[in-house]
Design a protein with these regions (language model features):
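Beta-propeller-forming repeat regions
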Residues: 18-199
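Bacterial N-terminal signal peptides
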Residues: 5-15
Length: 199
């Protein structure tokens, strides 16, 4: 009987050790983003002028783009004029692509439509608190204009040998090149860099 009691006690200890404790962090499992909810989020955070294009199979990517340990999001969206609602919805419009070439004032460049195939914008929400990018009051909101891409995905880039790699938005152009869009923590601005030419 004593042997059976010891076995049960040992089994209980093993089960307790395998179950997550209240004070231990549990890795978050990826939750798929529903398109209907995503459209509601875009409307609430950026206004009615933005819509999610139907042809994009992956219009949303998530990662910690600003390095604060909270999940952020980048959403592909369309808008004929992203500037007017920036005041009411408190988002910043940036043009990291043209800034790379020395001309990145979005008040002027947001009207550039040189390539009709690349007219989409990237909406970026920096997450805040437990709800991360789904928070009603996120840490920051941005509309990135004029970045040429056919699709986007999460990438990583090493800026310094002394620091771990950062998460970036990889902008992929099927017939031209890949590029990286990343948040410069020191200068508090978005940057664009060309990558490898697609063969």
């Amino acid at each position: 009987m004593k042997f059976l009691g010891n076995v049960l006690f040992l089994a209980a200890c093993v089960a307790a050790a395998q179950s997550p404790q209240a004070n231990q962090p549990v890795a978050a499992s990826p939750v798929p983003v529903e398109m209907a909810q995503l459209a509601v989020t875009v409307k609430q955070q950026f206004g009615d002028t933005f819509s999610i294009p139907a042809k994009f199979t992956t219009p949303v990517i998530t990662a910690d783009f600003d390095g604060d340990g909270v999940e952020d999001v980048a959403i592909v969206a369309n808008s004929k004029d992203p500037l007017p609602d920036s005041y009411a919805f408190k988002y910043e419009v940036a043009d990291p692509y043209h800034a790379y070439f020395g001309f990145g004032d979005p008040r002027l460049t947001s009207s550039f439509r040189a390539d009709p195939e690349h007219t989409h914008h990237l909406l970026v929400i920096f997450g805040s608190g437990k709800e991360a990018w789904r928070s009603v009051t996120p840490k920051g909101k941005f509309v990135l204009v004029n970045v040429p891409f056919d699709s986007v995905e999460v990438g990583r880039m090493l800026l310094s040998k002394k620091k771990p790699p950062i998460f970036v938005i990889k902008a992929l152009e099927a017939q031209v090149m890949d590029s990286a869009i990343w948040w410069d923590v020191k200068k508090k601005r978005w940057r664009w860099e060309p990558g490898d030419t697609v063969q």
